[in-house]
Structure formats: C-alpha cells, structure tokens
C-alpha cells in the first residue's frame, strides 16, 4: 500500500486558524495600548477605521506574532506548534488545508484516497520543514506577509511601523519593538500614502 502525506500544507494557515480560534483569549493578553491600537483599526469596533479587512487581518497577525508569540523565529513557532508546546500546548490536533478542509495531523492518504494513521511519516515531514525553516532564519525576526497588488501594502507597512514606534516609545527596553525604520519611497504615490 503506497502512502503519501499532504503536499499543500502552509504553516501560516495554521497560525491564522490558531489565532481565529483563540482570538478573544489572545487579545485579552495584549497590553492596553495594543488593544486600543487594534480597536482603532478594527471596523467592527470603529466604523471610521481606515484599514480594509485584509489589511486589518494582516495587522492582527503581525501583532499576534510580535506581541503574543514574543516575536520568535518562524522555525521556533513551527517547532512549538508541531510538538504542541508553550503557546500551542492546547492547540487542536488537526490542520486546515487551503481548500478549507480540516484533516488530522497524524493521518495521511493512500494513493486511492483512504486515510491512514501515519505519525512517523508526519514526523518525518515536519522535521524536514523544521530544518528548512531553521536554515533560513534571520538575526532579527520581523514579518511582513504578502498581499495582492492594490490591496494596500504601503498603508499596512506604515501602520506596522507606527505600531512598532508607538510600543517602542512606551516600552523602550522591550527588544521586540524596533526604534528605527528606513523607508524607500520610489514614487509620489507611496509618498502620498
């Protein structure tokens, strides 16, 4: 019986699912300034908020990784997630696929589509992913994720920089927040933003 594991796994989807499932608990642990900053940018709480939904969701994930997770390297978050430790100790044992389907992590599929228990195969696959992530780590983890063209990356980046400066000013000794930013603006459109 030939067995294959899933090839459409994306860790950011697991982070997003974890955040959505625990959003209230996570946001309650943010400091007051962060909660006010998010509320100001959230159209559900502030109808006059400037950010559109995809921008706000990206900002929420940025703050989640920065403040709740402690700004770790991606490989560290992935290792904690796959081993269900620290922040992920109470995480569910399933993963969300790109098509929205949920599958158990410890299962794979045979070539004819049947699900089989594969803890060793899954462990091998996640170990390979972990090693790749660790290989490409940066000295200072700082994450800006891709948004499609025209969705407002410039405004989002400016909002993230403002968040960084706001918290760096309030908590100057907290190494999670940057105190400097270098911005290159190639044309007038970016400068107007």
Please place each PLM-identified region on the residue numbering.
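Charged, low-complexity intrinsically disordered regions
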Residues: 1-29, 44-45
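The conserved Walker
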Residues: 149-150
